[in-house]
């Protein structure tokens, strides 16, 4: 026997028993985003490597350690580690953002070479939103309101907490960076080699360290909010006022900076403790300089992304009664001379007239006992049964697989009306 080939570590299959929940969550995402007037876009999975180096930042962990990169002739290419850079590239390339606002969303797989753990994988899926052309904090508030509406649709709104911060302008961050480095230089004895490297290359990333001793020290570190420029401070205060007005609760987290270099002003995360240690479900913020940085005109921009694997785990944990639709509603079984064509015609009739129902036709042979065993295993609500006598009399036997009504025989012309009463 040939040796079997396994999936790559950190890149997982989604089983037939798991996909209905994924489909339900994705449907809620699509419904909420479309209801706000946002438009779906689809970008390539592979992009030019310099796109991410320029957008995300050379010294970030994502670019320096986690990207899947390869050469194609003389061009260096990368499996996308996130969606914003590719969406900005597409918006510039196709002229989507000029002379009007654009509110876009996307969904799909991303790739990062990091240590696989619960809710964090090397191939993972994100739904993301990017908005171009709106500078005022109203759109910041709308994105947060949009995510909150989605959490309610998913039944997880009581298990997530909104954390907010403003990281200000480039100049404000430069001033804060100097103050933070001056403070941290006296505590290098507590730092790992990686943290010492961050102190030199990207000191703001130390703010979200997992080192407990360093976390205690950072409680007394300079606060970024104290270094904000007037414009960023006013923007942040207006955002907080809007959230207060609509009743969305939040925590101001002065250590929240996000892991990518393109952010400015507003940054936010929705976090949960329902999966054990606190983890991020959704995060985003403003990136007003990124479009210009990637070759476009200066364009105010904001966006967020949410991890679908995390959402799946969270929904499974806190909302076990999700109304997930079965993969099969109706199972057609048949046996005897002349029944095959009749069964095919019946299955197609149901699919044509009741397209919202999932109808499976038994195709692997066997007697009725074996076929009913398959029907039960499928999770279907009804079995439609055709034998030789049903073909002759133009009838169908209906069996309720989940209990309830007794088995009954109906004329073929009445079968659609009857099925409609059962769903």
From Swiss-Prot:
It is an enzyme of class 6 (ligase). GO terms for cellular component: cytoplasm. Pfam families: HGTP_anticodon, tRNA-synt_His. Its main location: cytoplasm. It catalyses: tRNA(His) + L-histidine + ATP = L-histidyl-tRNA(His) + AMP + diphosphate + H(+). InterPro entries: aa-tRNA-synth_II (IPR006195), aa-tRNA-synth_II/BPL/LPL (IPR045864), Anticodon-bd (IPR004154), Anticodon-bd_dom_sf (IPR036621), His-tRNA-ligase (IPR015807), HisRS-like_core (IPR041715), HisRS/HisZ (IPR004516), HisRS_anticodon (IPR033656). Keywords: Aminoacyl-tRNA synthetase, ATP-binding, Cytoplasm, Ligase, Nucleotide-binding, Protein biosynthesis. The keyword Aminoacyl-tRNA synthetase applies. GO terms for biological process: histidyl-tRNA aminoacylation. It is found in: Cytoplasm. SUPFAM superfamilies: Class II aaRS ABD-related, Class II aaRS and biotin synthetases. GO terms for molecular function: ATP binding; histidine-tRNA ligase activity. Its EC number is 6.1.1.21. Belongs to the class-II aminoacyl-tRNA synthetase family. PANTHER family: HISTIDINE--TRNA LIGASE, MITOCHONDRIAL-RELATED (PTHR43707:SF1), HISTIDYL-TRNA SYNTHETASE (PTHR43707). Homodimer. This is Histidine--tRNA ligase. It comes from Haemophilus influenzae (strain PittEE). The gene is hisS.
